[in-house]
């Protein structure tokens, strides 16, 4: 749209209601604004000293300047404060009522009133990312505004010209083609109607009233730069606190923020806990915070003026269908939720009844189905004047609270081993690990399930032998099959009942179906509110199995009578409940496996069942208190399955999330050093699609169980590179704030997504094969409407396509995935597109092909996306243009920054709440770092004691973490990393002189800083395994890996050099070393003893080595000062180590792991102490 389209304000004409009957209720807003001026004043707050000096010079020279004149003219507006007055009192009192509640600016042309709370806010940014009025509307979830009466447009309520909607986030303006008229219309449906063309309005020119999180300048002016400098300075954090205050006290002011206790935060979660009491005291308040937030959310969601459609279900129960208004609440309606329906009209007596939701809005309709518990006196003849209340149920929170208390006070709630490990008291080197001694199955697969691959067999074997185990299942690696096999083997080996849990009903149902295939006796326990909801495993549900029991005829008769009449007499009801309870106990005690949600495990019906083992699937999506509900049921064996490189739990309360409630138990145990067994063969994605996620998030360890031919669709679609079914379509559309005010949409991207989808449908792809992913709810809702109304094919086809958020697609897969990125702006950033876990999930949902639609110029500013975009560009699949004429984009990106962690690049971006957790220091315990440590002390302690020593700290390998002494100001000693045991002691450093200053900063094992770089120098903690580090499977032939041959050759050459030269330490070392090596590559330094496994143990005067235990698998490391060391022999975080240095790396006990070397890229330390990477020609 040209800026010259409009005439000056004097030439504007306006529609008159009496003269214009094109649209009923039409109205326009008069304006005095010159529409040729589309410039926006600067929002910078800073004024340099040079500007101030220039003004001073002009004042002394008598130079008159318009800017200077404006400053002097505005001096009268300045508020000065007498010393005797109360601070800030005179300023507040003298402000007019229409002053901005944030900053105090009160120019009528720059302020807007919120119609919901009647407060005024300005259109200036201050120090925030958006204007103050937009900040308020978003945070308070208000939507309507009125302009000031003394402003250019007068006192005007902003509303749609056609339908009268007043939500400013959906309003925009359209210029008429013939007349200089500005018409306000909502985005959908009014601006999208074809009838606009008949009104001489150009609907293609529709623009939102809000751009860059400010109202357009011609609508509401922005305060001058001087005005913003003189105004009260308020930060985004203060705005948040003020908005929270207003929810409790509408009259609260800025001064109330200074009161004590306003910004109190709950105690942060810890990494380790002293005992169960401290554990409960930490998580209990967080659970209560989340419960209070959830209660407020639901109780404030009452909706009025509801129209109802009545129906009767197959079970003869009354069902009310109605449509809820599109709210901006964070609450999502789910099956089984309880609502209360009120009749408040005059045609019938007042009535209310509770029901549970049996239908939720979807692509086919917005109706909500509510099955009433009782239809007595229901006003079925009335269809209007109804109100809906959301009923808050505290069941889940109560169960979490009880589980935390039980964990603290009941010794029988968990075994001693699991109790100590959950508190973080276990040793990081696993030397105190308990193994179950007993027969192992000869065949690890389960009947009627696919045969397991090698990594799956190792995971099953590992889980069966240990009381606590973690299994990491990357996308498409058969996590559910592996879990079902573990459950089958547990039942066959140990007997008893196994409890299987997951955070969501969908995940539980999927796992239940797989376990049922193995012919085990499975019972699915679900909440009573969900008993009427159908699912693929409904026949296994406890209530349905009771109905089908042939043994109890009396119960069957009473059940039939209750179904027919709806209720029983009090005597019959009591008898019915007793018989049903007895039948439930009988079924549960006879079951091999009981499946339920994590919270469902707190059901009283399960309290009497003795569980031998517990398996929690998708444990990464559960909060820690949620996981504790099944854990405290007394089992001796716990298996957690998940993937902490994917999305974690959802916590609604931001305070609780900041305090660490959003951290899962799985992730904390990983940080504590319990290494997960990773499944490593993916069967979902085309090999080209798996390459980036594998190398970026999983250290290149994912193998392809399918070949390209298995994942090739035979259809007519213009892939830029036919052998690579993927591309990134460059789209330059601008983002807009969605109707909620808290989300975003991009109309240009939506149009491109529709064209791509239509092309696939015309090529023969079925709608259910396509999935459309977008990170933003606003874009999801817009896409649903856009494709149904604007799509060129029948709307029914588009309705059958699943359009969902990234979070909703976790655990799902589709043949074709189309992703809309949405974000496209100059200054606001890319929001949670920056989350590496969210990107990982989005990239790993597709089986046959993926298409990403977005603005690469904006996305490439973020390092994570820069890697992905360069990956696509290198493969010539970064394209632009129409589908029929796709051409390689000429956009050039900044070269990706070289990451220290080139082996596990994704972990560079992974951040966790635990990164800031402080470990509890129990006086006198094995974690107490306040005292010195003896030579033989087996501890997880620091090894940075200063002075001249050699690996003599209290570490997990006898004396020093990882078998080496951390260098201090005068010691660069024992840098053996536990591989071959170069634990040289004392004296000068390895270079024969004073230790370099960078050594302490780069080479010590900083257990907290490895997650968050800014904390790198702050902590000397005891987290032996970084979040991104996991077990690799041993003895898998190199041919299975899609690694560059250059990498393999480099490792082979490196090993040959090591074997020829051996390990040595130049300079004056200590009196001897104690080390662990393999064969003759062990470091000399004392008497050599060779055990039966062919490993050698060297003993001598040194103190930095690690005793070799059977089952350990150690690679020999070359001295860093002589030869490049494989990166996997160092920590794959900014400072650290590789897993192969730990005992138990080899899961095939007694054999040597080769995988670290095969997957590594060579790295060496340069003269300045930084890692220098010898990158290969194709790093991906």
UniProtKB/Swiss-Prot annotation:
Residues 21-51, 1062-1110 are annotated as: Disordered. SUPFAM superfamilies: P-loop containing nucleoside triphosphate hydrolases. Its main location: cytoplasm. It is found in: Cytoplasm; Cytoplasm, Cytoplasmic ribonucleoprotein granule. Transmembrane segments: none annotated. One of its GO terms (cellular component) is neuronal ribonucleoprotein granule. Zn(2+) 3 binds at residues 160, 163, 186, 190. It catalyses: ATP + H2O = ADP + phosphate + H(+). Pfam families: AAA_11, AAA_12, ResIII, UPF1_1B_dom, UPF1_Zn_bind. Zn(2+) 1 binds at residues 100, 103, 122, 132. Residues 40-51 have a biased composition (Polar residues). Residues 114-142 are annotated as: CC/SHH/C. Residues 1069-1078 have a biased composition (Gly residues). It is an enzyme of class 3 (hydrolase). RNA-dependent helicase and ATPase required for nonsense-mediated decay (NMD) of mRNAs containing premature stop codons. Is recruited to mRNAs upon translation termination and undergoes a cycle of phosphorylation and dephosphorylation; its phosphorylation appears to be a key step in NMD. The formation of an Upf1-Upf2-Upf3 surveillance complex is believed to activate NMD. This is Regulator of nonsense transcripts 1 homolog.
């Amino acid at each position: 749209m040209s800026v010259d389209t409009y005439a000056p304000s004097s030439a504007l004409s306006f529609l008159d209601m009496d003269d214009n009957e094109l649209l009923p209720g039409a109205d326009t807003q008069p304006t005095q604004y010159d529409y040729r001026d589309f410039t926006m004043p600067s929002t910078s707050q800073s004024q340099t000293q040079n500007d101030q000096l220039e003004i001073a010079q002009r004042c002394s020279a008598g130079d008159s300047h318009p800017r200077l004149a404006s400053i002097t003219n505005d001096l009268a507006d300045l508020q000065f404060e007498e010393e005797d007055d109360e601070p800030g009192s005179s300023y507040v009192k003298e402000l007019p009522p229409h002053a901005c509640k944030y900053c105090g600016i009160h120019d009528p042309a720059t302020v807007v009133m919120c119609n919901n709370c009647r407060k005024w806010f300005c259109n200036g940014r201050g120090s925030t990312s958006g204007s103050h009025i937009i900040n308020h509307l978003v945070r308070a979830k208000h939507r309507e505004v009125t302009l000031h009466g003394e402003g250019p447009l007068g006192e005007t309520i902003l509303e749609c010209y056609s339908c009268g909607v007043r939500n400013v986030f959906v309003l925009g303006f359209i210029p008429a083609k013939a007349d200089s008229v500005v018409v306000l219309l909502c985005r959908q449906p009014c601006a999208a109607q074809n009838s606009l063309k008949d009104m001489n309005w150009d609907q293609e020119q529709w623009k939102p009233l809000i751009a860059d999180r400010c109202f357009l300048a011609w609508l509401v002016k922005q305060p001058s730069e001087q005005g913003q400098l003189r105004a009260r300075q308020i930060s985004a954090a203060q705005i948040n606190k003020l908005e929270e205050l207003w929810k409790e006290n509408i009259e609260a002011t800025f001064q109330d923020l200074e009161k004590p206790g306003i910004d109190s935060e709950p105690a942060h979660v810890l990494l380790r806990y002293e005992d169960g009491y401290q554990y409960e005291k930490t998580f209990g308040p967080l659970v209560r915070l989340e419960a209070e937030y959830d209660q407020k959310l639901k109780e404030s969601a009452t909706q009025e003026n509801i129209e109802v459609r009545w129906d009767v279900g197959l079970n003869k129960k009354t069902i009310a269908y109605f449509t809820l208004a599109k709210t901006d609440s964070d609450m999502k309606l789910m099956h089984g939720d309880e609502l209360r329906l009120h009749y408040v009209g005059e045609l019938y007596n007042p009535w209310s009844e509770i029901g549970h939701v049996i239908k939720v809005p979807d692509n086919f309709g917005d109706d909500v189905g509510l099955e009433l518990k009782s239809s007595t006196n229901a006003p079925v003849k009335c269809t209007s004047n109804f109100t809906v209340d959301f009923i808050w149920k505290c069941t889940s929170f109560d169960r979490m609270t009880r589980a935390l208390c039980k964990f603290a006070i009941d010794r029988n709630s968990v075994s001693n081993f699991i109790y100590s490990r959950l508190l973080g008291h276990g040793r990081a080197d696993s030397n105190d690990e308990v193994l179950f001694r007993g027969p192992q199955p000869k065949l690890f697969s389960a009947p009627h399930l696919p045969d397991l691959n090698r990594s799956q067999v190792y995971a099953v074997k590992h889980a069966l032998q240990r009381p606590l185990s973690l299994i990491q299942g990357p996308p498409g690696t058969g996590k559910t099959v592996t879990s079902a096999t573990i459950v089958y083997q547990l039942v066959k080996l140990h007997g008893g009942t196994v409890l299987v849990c997951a955070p969501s009903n969908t995940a539980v149902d999927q796992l239940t179906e797989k376990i049922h295939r193995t012919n085990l006796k499975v019972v699915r326990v679900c909440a009573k509110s969900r008993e009427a909801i159908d699912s693929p495993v409904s026949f296994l549900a406890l209530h349905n199995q009771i109905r089908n029991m042939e043994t109890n005829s009396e119960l069957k008769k009473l059940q039939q009578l209750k179904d027919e009449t709806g209720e029983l007499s009090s005597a019959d009801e009591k008898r019915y409940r007793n018989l049903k309870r007895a039948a439930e106990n009988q079924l549960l005690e006879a079951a091999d496996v009981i499946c339920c949600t994590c919270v469902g495990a707190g059901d009283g019906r399960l309290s009497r069942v003795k569980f031998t083992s517990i398996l929690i699937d998708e444990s990464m999506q559960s909060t820690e208190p949620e996981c504790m509900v099944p854990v405290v049921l007394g089992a001796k064996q716990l298996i957690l399955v998940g993937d902490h490189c994917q999305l974690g739990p959802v916590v609604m309360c931001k305070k609780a999330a900041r305090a660490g409630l959003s951290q899962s138990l799985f992730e904390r145990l990983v940080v504590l050093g319990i290494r997960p067994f990773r499944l490593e063969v993916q069967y979902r994605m085309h090999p080209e699609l798996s390459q980036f996620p594998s190398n970026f998030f999983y250290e290149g360890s994912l193998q392809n169980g399918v070949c390209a031919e298995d994942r090739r669709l035979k259809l007519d679609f213009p892939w830029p590179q036919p052998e690579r079914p993927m591309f990134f379509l460059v789209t330059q559309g601008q983002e807009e704030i969605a109707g909620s005010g808290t989300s975003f949409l991009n109309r240009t991207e939506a149009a491109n997504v529709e064209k791509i989808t239509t092309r696939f449908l015309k090529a023969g792809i079925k709608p259910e094969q396509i999935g459309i992913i977008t990170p933003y709810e606003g874009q999801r809702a817009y896409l649903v409407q856009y494709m149904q109304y604007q799509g060129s094919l029948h709307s029914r086809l588009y309705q059958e396509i699943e359009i969902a958020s990234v979070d909703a697609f976790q655990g799902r897969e589709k043949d074709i995935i189309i992703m809309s990125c949405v974000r496209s702006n100059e200054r606001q950033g890319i929001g949670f597109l920056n989350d590496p876990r969210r990107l990982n999930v989005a990239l790993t949902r597709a089986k046959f092909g993926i298409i990403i639609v977005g603005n690469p110029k904006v996305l490439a500013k973020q390092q994570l996306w820069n890697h992905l975009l360069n990956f696509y560009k290198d493969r010539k699949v970064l394209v632009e243009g129409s589908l029929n004429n796709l051409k390689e984009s000429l956009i050039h990106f900044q070269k990706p920054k070289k990451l220290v962690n080139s082996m596990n690049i994704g972990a560079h971006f992974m951040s966790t709440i635990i990164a800031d957790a402080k470990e509890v220091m129990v006086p006198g315990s094995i974690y107490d770092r306040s005292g010195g440590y003896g030579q033989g002390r087996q501890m997880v302690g620091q090894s940075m004691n200063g002075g001249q020593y050699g690996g003599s700290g209290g570490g997990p390998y006898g004396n020093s973490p990882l078998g080496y002494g951390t260098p201090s100001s005068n010691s660069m000693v024992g840098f053996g990393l536990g591989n071959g045991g170069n634990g040289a002691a004392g004296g000068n450093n390895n270079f024969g002189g004073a230790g370099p200053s960078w050594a302490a900063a780069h080479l010590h094992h900083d257990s907290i800083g490895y997650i968050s770089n800014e904390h790198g120098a702050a902590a000397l903690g005891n987290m032996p395994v970084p979040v991104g580090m996991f077990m690799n499977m041993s003895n898998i032939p190199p041919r299975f890996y899609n690694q560059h041959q250059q990498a393999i050759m480099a490792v082979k050459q490196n090993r040959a050099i090591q074997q020829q030269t051996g390990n040595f330490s130049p300079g004056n070392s200590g009196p001897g070393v104690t080390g662990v090596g393999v064969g003759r590559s062990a470091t000399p330094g004392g008497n050599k003893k060779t055990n039966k496994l062919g490993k050698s143990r060297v003993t001598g005067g040194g103190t930095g080595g690690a005793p070799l235990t059977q089952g350990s698998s150690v690679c020999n490391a070359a001295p860093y000062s002589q030869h490049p060391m494989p990166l996997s022999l160092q920590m794959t975080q900014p400072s650290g180590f590789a897993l192969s240095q730990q005992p138990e790396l080899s899961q095939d006990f007694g054999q040597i792991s080769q995988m670290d070397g095969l997957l590594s890229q060579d790295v060496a330390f340069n003269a300045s102490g930084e890692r220098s990477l010898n990158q290969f020609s194709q790093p991906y």
